[in-house]
Amino acid sequence: MAAMNNMNPMWVPEGYESPLNIRETEVAIKCVKDFFEKELARQLNLTRVSAPFFVYPESGLNDTLNGVERPVHFGVKEQGDREVEIVHSLAKWKRFALKRYGFKHGEGLYADMYAIRRDEDTDHLHSILVDQWDWERIIYKEERNEETLRNIVKKVYKALKNTEKYMAIQYEYIEELLPSEISFMTTQELLDMYPDLTPKEREREIVREKGAVFLMKIGGALGSGEIHDGRAPDYDDWELNGDILVYYPLLDTAFELSSMGIRVDEEALTHQLEVRGCPERKDLMFHKALLNGELPYTIGGGIGQARICMFYLRKAHIGEVIASVWPDKVAETLEGRGVHLL
């Protein structure tokens, strides 16, 4: 099958036709989400909590992503037009919530997170509207190591694997694609294997071979001086994080289902802020609390709801499982090629 053309958002696999119409797709989306949410909570000992849709900029709680994406913001009338920002993710908010809500070691929370990423370049896998399960769990400081990370990754992967088994029972056309176990590899090891390829090309090559990979150590500079992918400096520890990538044969591409990691401690936060050239963030509320030792040590991540629905339902475009907006020409062309956007 031809590889997905990342330069052409209107490309559709030849002969593609989803077995489900729009109404059947909506039912199947609920089926996926209900099962996976319970399975994730069971594997990681998580309690569902309500999530904010916007936060105050000065709190430092919003996710700055790669540092260039502009948050959507507006003024609140009753507060004299005090500005709030729609969240990009709940990566930092969750650590505050764990402390405030009285969670203990080995316990965690998850929330349904909705975000607007206005500067996203949309394609088959990316939309302006983002929905994900944001989760976070308390660990001891001495558990901030690769062994802990690997153990939690295996639990998340088990939830993903069990969900695929469940959906294969519910729908005859769904066959199991995920391997029984996930492989682990660092970004430096991947660069050494494929030094002449781009980061995204490297990811595709390794998941073609392995089926499912947890790609570790994302955000810091590699031996070549390049960064595999951008990460904000103030939630993941770049030495103890990664992405769950799986192979998606319909699009012949690496498919990111989750980004997760052990969160920064005082030392990692200070170092990473210096590397990114933004030490002034230490004066924000979140960063002050962390540096003062007031927040728990945690591991956490985000799992794309539309992403896993697209993957399990074997859809060609994320717009088939999330109601977002698309350029007129893209929407019209996709509709004419059998891709029915919500």
Where are each of the predicted segments found?
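Class II aminoacyl-tRNA synthetase-like tRNA-binding/catalytic domains
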Residues: 2-126, 134-138
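A generic secondary-structure signal for well-formed alpha-helical elements
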Residues: 40-47, 156-167, 316
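N-terminal pre-domains immediately preceding structured catalytic cores
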Residues: 58-63, 177-185, 327
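A general structural signal for short secondary-structure junctions and capping/turn motifs
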Residues: 74-77, 99-105, 125-127, 175, ...
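Extracellular structured ligand-interaction cores
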Residues: 107-109, 130-134, 210-212, 252-254
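Extended, charged alpha-beta segments that form solvent-exposed binding/catalytic grooves
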Residues: 111-197, 201
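A translation/RNA-centric and nucleic-acid-associated enzymatic feature enriched
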Residues: 114-116, 187-342
